[in-house]
């Protein structure tokens, strides 16, 4: 014969199970976004991150403004071609990289520099994303999962560098390895498609080198023997908006 308390334990266990099941169902009915967010975070970003991501690597850039020529936009053109952006941009076209001319107060020497997603170690765009569409790979690259992005644009407001764009218009002539989508937010990916193919250079750095300026150096910041690490040790560098303590992966010399 069963102990008299066995049926009580079984009933209690059944009630707990049914209670959890009901709570789960209520969660789906009342707040479907919660479950979708968890699914997106568990599957979407990790799948989108690709098998090429290496936790021992931190990809980054060094921009030497003393070598960056005012009026030169070869880096912008190369980025547009590589990623299938508009060859003739309109006011609403996406900009993954843009040239900015500055004249620092008290110095009087104009500066020209490219600004793109800074691939922060503490990215505010990821913090504010309600669906998990904005995420950071283990190798430091900050990306957007376009299957999960709902176009709320909170990340655009959170980015202190204004480095993200919203796709307003239908897209044509997309690159197979650079999927994009109307109604989504996007930004510089450090040419992640190249990295995952084993190529260790970005289109903008390659184009800048071809001009002879060599103002953009791309590489692994965690490798002490990489060119970017050697250059960072040899010259003074700063981050844009260093006061925010976001630890950007893009460093600048000469600002």
Regions of interest found by a model, annotated:
Residues 11, 31-70, 237, 242-255:
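C-terminal segment of N-terminal export signals and the immediately downstream linker at the start
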Residues 196-199, 203-255:
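Long, compositionally biased charged/polar accessory segments in the mid-to-C-terminal portions
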Residues 5-9, 46-54, 67, 102-108, ...:
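Asp/Glu-centered strand-loop micro-motifs enriched in Gly/Pro and often flanked by an aromatic residue
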Residues 22, 26, 84, 196:
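Hydrophobic/aromatic-lined pockets within catalytic cores
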Residues 62-82, 109-132, 143-162, 180-211, ...:
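Cysteine-centered iron-sulfur cluster-binding motifs in ferredoxin-type domains/subunits
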Residues 37-50, 80-113, 135-148, 163-186, ...:
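Non-heme iron-sulfur electron-transfer modules
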Residues 2-25:
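N-terminal secretory signal peptides and thylakoid transit peptides that target proteins
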């Amino acid at each position: 014969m069963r102990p008299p308390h066995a049926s009580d334990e079984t009933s209690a266990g059944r009630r707990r199970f049914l209670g959890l099941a009901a709570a789960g169902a209520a969660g789906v009915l009342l707040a479907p976004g919660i479950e979708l967010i968890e699914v997106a975070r568990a599957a979407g970003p990790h799948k989108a991150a690709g098998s090429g991501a290496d936790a021992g690597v931190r990809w980054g850039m060094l921009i030497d403004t003393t070598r960056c020529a005012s009026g030169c936009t070869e880096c912008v053109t190369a980025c547009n071609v590589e990623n299938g952006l508009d060859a003739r941009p309109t006011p609403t076209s996406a900009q993954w990289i843009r040239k900015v001319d500055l004249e620092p107060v008290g110095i009087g020497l104009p500066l020209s520099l490219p600004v793109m997603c800074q691939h922060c170690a503490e990215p505010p765009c990821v913090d504010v994303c309600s669906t998990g569409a904005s995420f950071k790979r283990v190798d430091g690259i900050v990306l957007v999962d376009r299957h999960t992005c709902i176009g709320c644009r909170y990340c655009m407001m959170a980015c202190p560098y204004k480095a993200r764009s919203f796709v307003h218009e239908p897209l044509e002539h997309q690159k197979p390895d650079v999927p994009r989508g109307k109604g989504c937010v996007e930004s510089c990916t450090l040419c992640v498609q190249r990295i995952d193919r084993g190529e260790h250079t970005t289109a903008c750095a390659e184009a800048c080198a071809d001009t002879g300026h060599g103002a953009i150096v791309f590489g692994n910041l965690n490798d002490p023997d990489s060119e970017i690490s050697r250059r960072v040790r040899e010259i003074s560098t700063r981050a844009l908006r260093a006061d925010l303590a976001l630890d950007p992966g893009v460093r600048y010399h000469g600002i």
